[in-house]
């Protein structure tokens, strides 16, 4: 997907880039697949900030995405490629032969008019958009929209340009190389879709101006060293003085290199950590 630049009629637009919308179908969204989501602004039910640097952002409706892909044995035709304000990849509107319509994450190579399907037992053609259980997918295949628990819906490789690779099979598990580089066992009964999530150039765009992040619901981040001692462990001092300690969060926990991953029962399924760690 092409990256476009903008005419610099203001200084902030000079280095701003965006993504071309040539692939988007000029067609309204399906109203039955749109729902309202409450904008919390990072606050809980008491109105207190529980997640900093968040706000409502621009108004948007949530598109209901089919992450389970369990409509077995019925072919569907790609009716439209649409923009989704809630995620960084495009979505595809699938019209099934029984009349139902659903949105799915659009992989690279899936275009209007293509026919896709999901299958419970057996395998399908290895082409973008088809979905099947991991145990029927050949070793070496690139997949996305991968479940971690059968029937729960996809949790892995859903972001723009994301994918996992099937590296091997052992009894009731398959071995996946995750987007992070981690090698992990996943139950062979889990569903996965073929291909790489589209819109991979999203990682290369330049935001260019603060207002664009505000549209996305991202508020400015204040450095701890610019605060007072009452507000942050790095705060205080005369002038631009360093904090005199290892970097910590506002609550005093180590950061920038400190491990934050919790121990879970499923850790035993990890064969090797990400990037060879």
UniProtKB/Swiss-Prot annotation:
Family to which this protein belongs: Belongs to the universal ribosomal protein uL2 family.
Residues spanning the signal sequence: none
Composition bias type Basic residues, residue spans: 256-277
Role summary: One of the primary rRNA binding proteins. Required for association of the 30S and 50S subunits to form the 70S ribosome, for tRNA binding and peptide bond formation. It has been suggested to have peptidyltransferase activity; this is somewhat controversial. Makes several contacts with the 16S rRNA in the 70S ribosome.
GO biological process: cytoplasmic translation
GO cellular component: large ribosomal subunit
Alphabetical UniProt keywords: Ribonucleoprotein, Ribosomal protein, RNA-binding, rRNA-binding
Organism: Campylobacter concisus (strain 13826)
Superkingdom: Bacteria
Pfam families: Ribosomal_L2, Ribosomal_L2_C
InterPro entries recorded: NA-bd_OB-fold, Rib_uL2_dom2, Ribosomal_uL2, Ribosomal_uL2_bac/org-type, Ribosomal_uL2_C, Ribosomal_uL2_CS, Ribosomal_uL2_dom3, Ribosomal_uL2_RNA-bd_dom
Subunit (UniProt): Part of the 50S ribosomal subunit. Forms a bridge to the 30S subunit in the 70S ribosome.
Basic and acidic residues composition-biased segments: 231-241
Bilayer-crossing regions: none
Name this polypeptide is given: Large ribosomal subunit protein uL2
Keyword Magnesium: no
Gene Ontology MF term list: rRNA binding; structural constituent of ribosome; transferase activity
Gene3D superfamilies, A to Z: 2.30.30.30, Nucleic acid-binding proteins (2.40.50.140), Ribosomal protein L2, domain 3 (4.10.950.10)
Region annotation (Disordered) ranges: 219-277
